[in-house]
Design a protein with these regions (language model features):
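Acidic anion/phosphate-binding donor-loop and adjacent secondary structure
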Residues: 257-260, 309-328
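A short, active-site helix/loop in glycosyltransferases that binds the activated sugar's phosphate group
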Residues: 275-303
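Conserved donor-binding/catalytic core segment of Leloir-type glycosyltransferases
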Residues: 322-341, 347-350
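Nucleotide-activated donor-binding/catalytic signature segment of Leloir-type glycosyltransferases, i.e.
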Residues: 377-397
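Aromatic "clamp/platform" in nucleotide-sugar-dependent glycosyltransferases that forms part
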Residues: 398, 417
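A short, well-ordered alpha-helix in the C-terminal region of glycosyltransferases
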Residues: 405, 464, 478-492, 501-504
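Short hydrophobic beta-strand element within catalytic cores of glycosyltransferases
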Residues: 434-438
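Conserved acidic donor-binding segment of nucleotide-sugar-dependent glycosyltransferases
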Residues: 449-451, 455-462, 470-477, 491
Length: 518
């Protein structure tokens, strides 16, 4: 079995989740058994995974595993289905707060029932109160309609411990909160009752997850692809039975991606890189990154270059949209609105372009990173006001329909500090969008081939970004030529092409695991 290790499958996905989904589809197409492992508990895990095309057969949640809820028939649970063990209760709807208030006949509160307006008022949680009006516990319900997590509260209204239960109410996992030396409430331990009823205790969720991975690995012979390094970078080096372990680099291994051989390490990969030879293989998305990893760390583990992006055949074979049918002047960026994306650089470039091409617009699609009180979003908004670009620069938020965005755009702009591949710019060229990017490691400076499907300009030179955009907007023939080049260059990421790269790794895994049996 192949396992892709992650924390979950959220509704708003990062490039890592999108890469997993593409890989899952590719492996399914080649009849390979595979599952996404989700370490963290989330009441909507199955709902969001199913919506993304991951059925329950291809999803393995750690909490599901112990709660016996890997496959459960869904039930639409509403307030009418709840039993509070009392009679003569009244229910008041506070629709503006998305909840019901449940009271005794004398007006004393029994519970607050929080519901999901987007899914027929399905119950999310119940906040339970004692006879003195004190909150004593909160019950969280899985989106499939059963109680899954109970949070117990202390007299000072803090979470004291949490329990995860089976659908029939048996507690199988607990965690505990205690005050540290500074008086701060801290999670101090985990308790597990495994499938045989044996009790185990762990100091951290990392140790619990390590135990779980060893149980999943069983007698060995499995392949684990670690997509979120910090979740199991050490655990995968301590599996008790043979397995083929893959450290997948989804971002720059260096803190300064432009100085990969000498800068401090990206803290997300620090442990893994310092223990690089404890993994069976290392995967990078570009040859440039693979070469840099080899040059700095000299691994004896196998290294493979495998693009994380896959362009479906139906996209490669779709009718091409000419520049004449696109909105003239439309520039797009599809990325988290986060500090490392430096979208303010792109706004500065658009301001320069607008002086000569008044039709230009910049539409930014992506969810807003809350770091430093949404600093990146505020920078874009502040520059938009400073340059009087209201209605020209537009923050559009997250979208699930990027195809429509790309099919109407002429240019994709990218000004990041670093990337691990950048699925968005790969998807953009597959729709004929011309890329204009900084010479940034890793991905954009490989996906965009300077002079063929766009332009790669000097790092940090937003003036050059503006100049290249102006060159394209002022020369329709050049824009069309570059768009044609974009369509053609996307064939590098066809399913067949990417599969050939994965097949090399899988062949090595088969040989390695066969050797471990001797």
């Amino acid at each position: 079995m192949l396992y892709f290790v992650n924390f979950g499958m959220p509704d708003h996905k990062s490039g890592i989740e999108h890469a997993e989904l593409k890989r899952l589809q590719l492996f399914e197409d080649h009849q390979l058994p595979c599952k996404i492992i989700a370490r963290d508990w989330n009441r909507t895990l199955h709902m969001t995974a199913n919506a993304a095309g991951v059925d329950d057969d291809h999803l393995l949640g750690m909490f599901d595993y112990y709660q016996h809820t890997e496959k459960v028939v869904s039930k639409h649970l509403t307030v009418a289905d709840l039993d509070f063990g009392l009679q003569n209760l009244t229910t008041q709807d506070e629709s503006e707060k998305h909840r019901y208030i449940v009271k005794r006949k004398n007006g004393a509160m029994v519970a607050r029932v929080n519901y999901d307006d987007q899914h027929g008022r399905q119950v999310i949680s119940t906040e339970m109160f004692d006879g003195y009006g004190n909150l004593y516990c909160v019950n969280f319900y899985d989106s499939r309609g059963f109680k899954s997590l109970i949070q117990w509260y202390s007299p000072d209204n803090k979470i004291d411990n949490e329990e995860w239960v089976t659908p029939d109410g048996k507690t199988v996992i607990r965690d505990y909160y205690k005050k540290d030396v500074h008086g701060k409430l801290t999670k101090t331990g985990w308790w597990l009752s495994d499938h045989q009823g044996i009790i185990h205790q762990f100091a951290t969720i990392d140790r619990l997850f390590e135990f779980f991975l060893n149980q999943v690995n069983g007698e060995g012979g499995n392949i684990f692809i670690l997509d979120r390094s910090l979740l199991a970078d050490d655990a995968l080096t301590r599996l008790k039975k043979p397995a083929y372990t893959v450290m997948h680099l989804h971002n720059s291994q260096a803190g300064d991606a432009q100085n990969p051989l000498h800068s401090i390490l990206n803290n997300n990969y620090e442990y893994a890189l310092n223990n690089i030879n404890k993994y069976s293989a290392i995967v990078s998305a570009t040859q440039r990154q693979t070469d840099d990893v080899i040059a700095r760390f000299h691994p004896t583990s196998k290294t493979f270059t495998i693009p994380v992006g896959i362009v479906p055949d139906k996209v490669l074979q779709a009718p091409r949209i000419t520049e004449a049918k696109r909105t003239f002047g439309k520039v797009v960026a599809v990325a988290r609105v986060a500090p490392e994306k430096r979208l303010d650089h792109l706004v500065r470039a658009i301001n320069e372009v607008h002086k000569q091409v008044p039709e230009v617009t910049l539409d930014i699609y992506g969810y807003y990173d809350p770091t430093n009180k949404y600093e990146a979003k505020r920078k874009v908004e502040d520059l938009t006001k400073k340059y009087h670009l209201e209605g020209i620069v537009n923050l559009k938020g997250y979208t699930n329909d990027v195809a429509s965005v790309y099919n109407d755009a002429q240019i994709f702009g990218l000004t990041s500090v670093m990337e691990g591949f950048d699925l968005a710019i790969m998807e953009a060229i597959s729709h004929g969008v011309v890329g204009v990017t900084y010479d940034v490691n890793y991905g954009p400076n490989d996906i965009i081939q300077d002079g063929k499907n766009g332009y790669v300009v000097d790092f940090n030179d937003w003036h050059a970004i503006a100049d290249r955009m102006l060159e394209l907007f002022k020369n329709p023939q050049l824009m069309q030529k570059m768009s044609d080049g974009a369509y053609e260059s996307a064939n590098r990421y066809s399913p067949d092409s990417v599969w050939q790269n994965w097949n090399k790794l899988l062949t090595d895994a088969k040989q390695t695991l066969k050797g471990s049996e001797k």
